Amino acid sequence: MLEFKHVSYHYPATPPVIPDLSFKIEKGEFVALAGSNGAGKSTISRLSNGLLLPSSGEVTVGGFNTKTTRASQIARKVAFLFQNPDRQICQNTVREEVSFGMRVQGFPEEEIKARTEAALETFSLNGDWSPFTRSRGERQRLALASVLAGKPELVILDEPTTGLDYKECTAIMDHIAKLNREEGLTILMVCHDMELIQSYAGRVLVLNRGTLLGDGPTRQIMKDRELLSKARLRPAQIPDLALRLGAGFEDVYTVDEMAALLQKRAGHKEGEE
């Protein structure tokens, strides 16, 4: 679905932000791109959707080279959800906002109407609302509805839960995870929050200064304290606690697993007494 082949990128008169990067994301994967500030996450996300073109190397999306494919064709395959929803909201009503991207891409009018109404229903949005009078959580839901209405094959999420409370965060991420699980939507989530990554991503790419330090299943990456330290990332709490507790806790990964093991150990102690 998305492949980087020896990609480098540099801004004019500066050293490379991305020196030499290669990775591949298959259709239907939920992948997190993790790194601290300055790791190159934003540059990679913009290279992934064709907003930036590589200085050298090749980026392909669904088999199409971003350097040689029309931007409109890439836009039909890749959707981008900004960290701040206000960066993409520009229409007077919610309905106009959801339909705007599809109209720009040249979708037939009847299809635009059908997809818009379906998106409004899915995300419980009133099409007549003004986007600028809604809460941050509602605006983020609107931005996501707009992104998904065009049925992209790959969605890039840039720190998608920044500024949201726990309830709003869970609602949005659960919906994204459901689309990934049930419809095979490919997700690339740019994120530094390891708790969020642990909860949703199946695989993690760990970056530091544009270099790929690690690539593997989330469970494996979460237990590699040396790797996370090199990338200046704070470990998720439960896997880190399990590593600190040592023998017998090595395989513990979630709150439920930790609770089950502690309960089991407590039961053994009661039996011994």
Which positions does each model-derived feature cover?
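Conserved ABC ATPase "signature" region
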Residues: 110-127
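A short, flexible loop at the N-terminus of ABC-type nucleotide-binding domains that lies
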Residues: 1, 8-20, 68-70, 109
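The feature captures the beta-strand-to-loop junction immediately N-terminal to the Walker
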Residues: 34-36
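Conserved ABC transporter NBD signature motif
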Residues: 57-65, 74
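Helix-to-loop junction immediately C-terminal to a conserved catalytic motif
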Residues: 49
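Conserved ABC ATPase "signature" C-loop
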Residues: 209-210
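Catalytic Walker B motif of ABC-type/P-loop ATPase nucleotide-binding domains
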Residues: 155-158
